[in-house]
Regions:
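Conserved alpha/beta enzyme-core scaffold
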Residues: 1-193
Length: 193
């Protein structure tokens, strides 16, 4: 597989298909792979499940995919700044799997490490635990959470090399490292090669 591409569109060539799961790095709008998201929008791929810290804003980040109606499901921990996202969820046009932030990070890490699931106390006894397996450990209730795997992971790194090693700096070191590992394929946009 070629390691360096002329642009984001070329990097995603041959990887995209309707109904796929895409995990995208970033925290809020910091460290998001905006060029790869734009290439995904331009591809017209639809019925996507998108996984990330948030749903972007109306005209940037993952919000661009929502605006073009390419998404069927969102798995995220924060969704409060995107009016189109809110409209689609309330109208029943979009499925939402709201996941606590730490749990989402661990689900991504677990998926990347090949761990199918883990138990956590987070969300125990809440609506988020409904329909999930629960167990008692040391007299406390724990909820089973499954690891997340994606068909493609897209991230933004400060630096990368031709072997695929990535360096994330400062706030961009948020969800990018975990998301980089959870995809069958990872594509990144780096500032330096």
């Amino acid at each position: 597989m070629k390691k360096v591409y002329a642009d984001a569109t070329a990097a995603l060539q041959g990887l995209l298909h309707d109904g796929m799961t895409v995990a995208a790095g970033g925290f809020g709008l910091c460290g998001i792979p905006e060029n790869l998201i734009k290439a995904l929008v331009d591809s017209g791929t639809k019925d996507l499940t998108i996984v990330g810290n948030n749903a972007g804003v109306d005209d940037f980040g993952m919000g661009l995919l929502l605006k073009t109606r390419q998404v069927k499901k969102v798995i995220a921990s924060y969704v409060g700044e995107n009016k189109e996202f809110e409209r689609q969820v309330l109208a029943g046009e979009l499925e939402l799997q709201l996941t606590p932030q730490g749990t989402l990070a661990e689900k991504l890490r677990a998926g990347g490490a090949g761990i199918p699931g883990f138990y956590t106390r987070t969300a125990s006894g809440t609506l988020l635990a409904e329909g999930k397996d629960t167990r008692k450990f040391d007299g406390k209730d724990y909820v089973l959470e499954e690891g997340i795997r994606a068909d493609v992971a897209i991230v933004k790194a400060w630096k990368g090399d031709k072997s695929g090693n990535l360096v994330f700096r400062k706030t961009s070191r948020n969800f990018n490292p975990m998301i980089a590992t959870c995809g069958d394929v990872c594509k990144h946009r780096g500032s330096h090669l």
